[in-house]
Design a protein with these regions (language model features):
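Generic detector of N-terminal low-structure segments
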Residues: 11-12, 40
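Bacterial N-terminal signal peptides that target proteins for export
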Residues: 14-17, 21-31
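Structured catalytic-domain cores with a bias toward divalent-metal coordination
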Residues: 45-327
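Bacterial N-terminal signal peptides
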Residues: 31-42
Length: 327
């Protein structure tokens, strides 16, 4: 009823403005823009946003779960937080814990949840701080121990598939398809020693790529891996960020952390990067802190040993190397 009433007011005002003298053109436009903004804010204030069991009205923060029913294997329950700002704006999805032992990224989103004040937010933030529950509980790196699959390799998922596929399906439907922007967080697994970096997924669409490029620069990690060979088929998107990008929702992936540890600096990079990105998206007041001199990495090489054993590095992570160097 309230939306219909607002619409009627807008229609009547437009009719009235149409008959106003030409000399009042600028005033008419100003009034119309003000009325549209007022109506948009009024509708936003009256509406709530629900993901899973979490429902937040304007100016509220709500917690709940995404319930994944049992099928060929066990059910699972994923925590979700919805932060509904006090003012209209885009919907931003933040997802971490696809690999449950990448702790820095999980803790970073917990920090973001605690930091964000709905009164200061324009728009809505959906946060999934821990997706791979079994991996976290059993301390299993890389995969979901329930079905042995990585939770960042089976998007957009299957409604009747294994647990990993069902989780991916629900996230696609409940989160990806309802957001405007997305960030996928990683934190250096138990057997990884990584320097902080972002992924810039180039789609070939100039307008879309300009947005995702600005997103990685606004996030603030100065090393950026450029991915231009991601699957183009939305039905076989494979990665979470790619699932959003193939559906027209600008998305990036970020990583900070190493060896399954929680270091204050890594957590701060991810948490502060999130706030800077939200400023770029006009979801928080203030200006973003953009990377001024990014290092663009266009190629990733893997150096494999031809013998089994234990690897003892002689260089620190982030060290520049060249052919022939002992690493």
């Amino acid at each position: 009823m309230k939306r219909a009433y607002t619409s009627t007011i807008l229609q009547r005002t437009l009719s009235l403005l149409a008959y106003t003298a030409p000399a009042m053109k600028l005033t008419r436009i100003t009034c119309l823009l003000s009325l549209v903004a007022f109506c948009s804010a009024a509708v936003f204030a009256q509406s709530s946003f629900t993901v899973g069991t979490a429902t937040a009205a304007a100016g509220q923060k709500a917690t709940g779960t995404l319930e994944i029913p049992a099928a060929a294997d066990a059910a699972t329950s994923i925590p979700v937080v919805v932060i509904r700002g006090s003012k209209p704006g885009p919907v931003l999805a933040l997802v971490s814990g696809a690999h449950g032992t990448e702790y820095a990224s999980i803790i970073a989103l917990e920090k973001v949840i605690q930091t964000l004040d709905p009164a200061q937010v324009s728009g809505t933030v959906i946060i999934l701080p821990l997706v791979n529950i079994a991996s976290f509980e059993q301390k299993v790196p890389h995969v979901n121990p329930v079905d042995g699959k990585s939770m960042n390799r089976f998007y957009p998922g299957k409604q009747d598939g294994t647990q990993t596929e069902r989780v991916s399906y629900v996230i696609t439907k409940q989160v990806v398809e309802r957001c405007d922007y997305l960030v996928d967080y990683h934190g250096g697994d138990i057997d990884e020693n990584l320097r902080p970096y972002s992924y810039w997924p180039k789609s070939g669409d100039a307008k879309h790529d300009a947005i995702t490029r600005d997103m990685v620069l606004a996030f603030g990690l100065d090393h950026v891996i450029v991915w231009s060979d991601r699957p183009k088929d939305p039905a076989a998107s494979r990665y979470l960020d790619n699932t959003a990008n193939t559906r027209g929702k600008p998305a990036i992936a970020v990583e900070a952390g190493y060896s399954g540890t929680v270091q204050t600096d890594d957590v701060a990079l991810l948490a502060n990067g999130t706030l800077s990105l939200m400023r770029y998206l006009k979801m928080l007041p203030g200006a973003p802190t953009m990377v001024e001199h990014p290092v663009w990495l266009g190629k990733v090489d893997t150096v494999a040993s031809d013998q089994p054993g234990i690897f003892y590095p002689v260089v620190q992570r982030g060290t520049y190397v060249e052919a022939g160097m002992k690493i």
